[in-house]
Amino acid sequence: MEQRVIISTQLESELVSALSECEHDKLFVLTDTTTLELCMPVLQSFYCMKEAHIITIPATDSHKDIDSLMMVWKGLQEGGASRHSCMINLGGGMITDLGGFAASTFKRGINFINIPTTLLAMVDASVGGKTVINFGGLKNEVGVFNDSKFVILDTEFLKTLDAENICSGYAEMLKHGLISTEAMWEELVSFDLDKPDLKQLQRMVGDSVKVKERIVEQDPHEQGIRKALNLGHTFGHAFESWALKRKPILHGYAVAFGLIPELYLSVAKTGFPTEKMRQTVNFIKEFYGTLDITCDDYDELIELMHHDKKNQNGIINFTMLGGIGDIRINQTATIEEIKEALDFFREG
């Protein structure tokens, strides 16, 4: 299924148009407890939403699990959903990931529309057809590839976000800059995240989405170049799963932290320029701080990396860079090199 991404200037009319192309007998909206309060009132003011059934699940990524998935299935079932129904996922990455999976599996699949409300969801989670939940203490363990019919990006929702959630989404934009062009990367590492210019950010969101769209179009099921989007995620997912048992961190923070050791490995193994690595790392440390790991945590982190779905034949798989936009997929590193990269993360 082809996904259409709309950068919205008039949410109501664009939603009406999208719904007219998603013929449906019943309409459902999935929210979490946060977006129900902050974002749903916008949709409820639209005439096209007057008969929509609202399903609400608990907020935060710790609830992106099978219990919440069952709540959504139950809400669809009790609301009388059929194979011809449609669900709108209104929320951040947790909602678009889990809602997409629920819609893709209920009655073998119903149409769904993503309206992302966080920066992270706008530039990453809602685009590209990955639908997924966490399982067994592991991040993004169970899911399917299935495109939403539409993704409608309304950057007005960014005004509902706190600084931490802006930073979280921005990490994926920084990754997109690293795998794209020098000009894009330079703008991203020069941006003041402490006092973000929302107008500038809105334009940058459009640029960032285009990077992901271009890559996904070439490789929808992650057999090759789409692995570029995994930059920062091999260490990042391990950091995120490690933190889940202690003090959970937002996904974008985990990705930002993951970029540090992965750029270090890129310098050591694929010739990424040291100065550009330093500039990127300094930006991350300035706006994201650090994660309080010790060398005693290395074995647990490496074990978590061994569960990464990108791995082949039990070997931990990385995406590295030879330069800005010079993508090297399917790279490996020894355990000693991984530990050196973790040393750099802690001390560099």
For every predicted segment, state its role:
Residues 190-299:
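Active-site segments that bind and position negatively charged phosphate/pyrophosphate groups
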Residues 101-193:
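A glycine/threonine-rich phosphate-anchoring loop and its flanking beta-alpha core
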Residues 1-86:
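ATP/NTP phosphate-donor binding region
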Residues 94-100, 122, 238:
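Short glycine/serine/threonine-rich phosphate/pyrophosphate-binding segments
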